[in-house]
């Protein structure tokens, strides 16, 4: 979703929310939570508050009037009834034959509500320095996580990674082959953004930074002499991330055309730009997702930017055999989340042995 449209929709949701949700929004914006995350959370709150009113658990006539007392006194059975409602309500997708929403969606809803309840019962302070209330019903609600072993995850994900020579082959495909599949009109559009698109893909493959971190990069955050980028990690922490040397020529090529191609002025600090009605704007996450999907589908298999992050992590572990180094590169506090890459590499080694 375009940033301007995203902010417009956020304002629409804020206009119907209770005052304490607006306080929550402001607090999380300072962390900072991404606008995308906050937008998704506001959608979940709207759905929850509408259910409270429809179920007569709140006597409010509108969402903005749902009071704190209602949230404080909701029981575990009430929350379980809400989960059951999510499971059994008709799907909003008219093309879907499924009844209810997926477990992933339910988990996202519960995560949003847990975040709100934690804020109201632990983080916020009233005029007496106390939270608004103390009873957190969300701590009693169990979530069902998708059961899948690391080996199964590795098997599912490795087909969507560009390992070994495929990393450079993918970049070469975008650079030298992709446009020959296009019409003359499509070629003109491709050539306009070719250097930028290659720079984005190269940076993701060479650093493993998250999509949101790439989107939010400013010019001052990129040091091509040191091959470092400064990013804001989850939780608002700043981090310096090393970038592999193969990305440098692509980043330099983009910078050489950035000013003239996108009409960038001094105040346009975003590193990756797009032209909207002739004016430079920071590129948004959805544009990068579509771009990566389009190129990767033509090359091998349609993937997301997050799979490029997995690609870097797997290649780095394959080279170093160090989970600590990989976790530092990805910005993880623990090596536990890097266990996946050991399984992928071990599978690749086994496949290589089978060919001997």
UniProtKB/Swiss-Prot annotation:
Alphabetical UniProt keywords: Cell cycle, Cell division, Chromosome partition, Cytoplasm, DNA integration, DNA recombination, DNA-binding
UniProt-annotated location(s): Cytoplasm
Domain Core-binding (CB), chain residue ranges per copy: 16-121
BP GO annotations: cell division; chromosome segregation; DNA recombination
NCBIfam families xref list: PRK05084.1 (NF003462)
Name of protein: Tyrosine recombinase XerS
Biological role: Site-specific tyrosine recombinase, which acts by catalyzing the cutting and rejoining of the recombining DNA molecules. Essential to convert dimers of the bacterial chromosome into monomers to permit their segregation at cell division.
Positions annotated as active site in the UniProt record: 210, 234, 306, 309, 332, 341
Family: Belongs to the 'phage' integrase family. XerS subfamily.
Superkingdom of the source species: Bacteria
Secretion signal, residue range per the UniProt entry: none
Gene Ontology cellular-component terms listed: cytoplasm
UniProt GO MF annotations: DNA binding; tyrosine-based site-specific recombinase activity
HAMAP family: Recomb_XerS
Regulation: FtsK is required for recombination.
Residues annotated as domain Tyr recombinase: 169-354
PROSITE patterns found in the cross-reference section: CB, TYR_RECOMBINASE
InterPro entries per record: CB (IPR044068), DNA_brk_join_enz (IPR011010), Integrase-like_cat_sf (IPR013762), Integrase_catalytic (IPR002104), Integrase_recombinase_N (IPR010998), Integrase_SAM-like_N (IPR004107), Recomb_XerS (IPR023670), Tyrosine_recombinase_XerCD (IPR050090)
């Amino acid at each position: 979703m375009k940033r301007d449209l995203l902010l417009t929709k956020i304002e629409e949701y804020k206009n119907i929310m209770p005052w304490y949700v607006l306080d929550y929004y402001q607090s999380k914006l300072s962390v900072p939570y991404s606008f995308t995350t906050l937008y998704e959370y506001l959608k979940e709150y709207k759905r929850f508050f509408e259910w409270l009113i429809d179920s007569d658990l709140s006597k409010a006539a509108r969402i903005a009037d749902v009071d704190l007392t209602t949230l404080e006194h909701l029981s575990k059975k009430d929350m379980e009834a809400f989960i059951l409602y999510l499971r059994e309500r008709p799907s909003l997708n008219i093309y879907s034959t499924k009844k209810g929403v997926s477990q992933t969606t339910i988990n996202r809803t519960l995560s949003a509500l847990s975040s709100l309840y934690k804020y109201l019962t632990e983080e916020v302070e009233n005029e007496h320095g106390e939270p608004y209330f103390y009873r957190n019903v969300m701590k009693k609600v169990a979530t069902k996580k998708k059961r899948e072993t690391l080996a199964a995850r590795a098997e599912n994900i490795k087909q969507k990674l560009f390992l070994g020579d495929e990393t450079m082959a993918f970049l070469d495909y975008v650079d030298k082959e992709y446009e020959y599949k296009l019409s003359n009109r499509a070629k003109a559009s491709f050539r306009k953004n070719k250097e930028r698109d290659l720079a984005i893909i190269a940076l993701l493959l060479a650093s493993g930074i998250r999509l949101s971190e790439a989107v939010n990069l400013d010019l001052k955050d990129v040091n091509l002499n040191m091959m470092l980028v400064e990013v804001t990690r989850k939780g608002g922490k700043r981090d310096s991330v090393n970038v592999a040397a193969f990305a440098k020529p692509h980043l330099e090529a983009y910078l050489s055309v950035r000013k003239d191609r996108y009409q960038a002025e001094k105040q346009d600090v975003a590193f990756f730009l797009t032209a909207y009605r002739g004016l430079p704007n920071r590129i948004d996450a959805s544009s990068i997702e579509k771009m990566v999907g389009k190129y990767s589908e033509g090359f091998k298999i349609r993937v997301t930017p997050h799979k490029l992050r997995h690609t870097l992590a797997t290649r780095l572990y394959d080279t170093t055999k160090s989970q600590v180094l990989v976790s530092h590169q990805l910005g993880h506090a623990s090596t536990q989340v890097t266990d996946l890459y050991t399984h992928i590499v071990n599978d690749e080694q086994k496949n290589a042995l089978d060919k001997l």
